Amino acid sequence: MIYSRSRLPSEGEILIATVKQVFDYGSYITLDEYGGLQAFLPWSEVSSKWVKNIRDVLKENRKVVVKVIRVDRRKGTVDVSLKKVTDDERRKKNLQWKKIQRLDKILELVSQQLKLSEKDAWEQVAWKLEAKYGDPISAIERAVKEGEKILIDAGVPEIWIKPLLEEAAKHTEEKKVKMSGLITVKTSEPLGVQKIKEVMSKALENIEQDYESILNVKIYTIGAPRYRVDVVGTNPKDASEALNQIISNLIKIGKEENVDISVVKK
């Protein structure tokens, strides 16, 4: 379980959340980095474009990246926005989230070895490394390569150091796999370039959240009308499934937007 130093997030924070309940007027979500704290996503903050049905955008149990827009510390309530998160913020958060998950897994295993709680691990290891270096998992990776002084300098208690380094060494080197597909994209619509960009952006939504092992996805031209779809991850099965899902999304959304998309090679 992931523990935060603060009970409530701050306005402007970008967070990973899980959709729990979807209503006509909005959605209740839980903030994964704040112990499952409930937050409210108003309908007006779901999309910057008109959406006929909120369930076309939000699905229960799906991970989403949100921005905190209001915090009432007296009542303990939090409101968030989906539409205010930029593509760059979403990409960076997904990469950070994968690091946080790796950190959490390492701390869980080490705390079990030491017969201590996961909260102890976060307080005595993660928070100390964060205070000293900013990014706990990067600090642990440095310690694996450079030695225990990295941990000692941050004030990590001695009891954690040896088992932490041993466990972290098993998790720091992940082999990457890359899956690619070729497609052709054509449209006779006015503002066709913008329309194609919108279709591609929609097709990539939630892919990195739905597949935890996926590190990066992108679609780029190799000479119009040909485009390449690249999926990079650490699990070949997930990478293949994600690629198929993206191409399926492209074809489906393309039909809805009068953009003709066909597969050249997968």
From Swiss-Prot:
Alphabetical keyword list: Initiation factor, Protein biosynthesis, RNA-binding
Keyword RNA-binding found: yes
Presence of keyword Nuclease: no
Coiled coil ranges: none
An example molecular function term from Gene Ontology annotations: ribosome binding
Pfam families: EIF_2_alpha (PF07541), S1 (PF00575)
SMART domains: S1 (SM00316)
Domain S1 motif, first and last residues per copy: 12-83
CDD domains to which the protein is assigned, alphabetical: S1_IF2_alpha (cd04452)
InterPro entries reported in the protein's UniProt record: NA-bd_OB-fold, S1_domain, S1_IF2_alpha, TIF2_asu_arc, TIF2_asu_C, TIF2_asu_middle_sf, TIF_2_asu
TM stretches of this protein: none
Function as written in the Swiss-Prot or TrEMBL entry: eIF-2 functions in the early steps of protein synthesis by forming a ternary complex with GTP and initiator tRNA.
Assembly description: Heterotrimer composed of an alpha, a beta and a gamma chain.
Family listed: Belongs to the eIF-2-alpha family.
This protein's name: Translation initiation factor 2 subunit alpha
Organism in which the protein naturally occurs: Saccharolobus islandicus (strain L.S.2.15 / Lassen #1) (Sulfolobus islandicus)
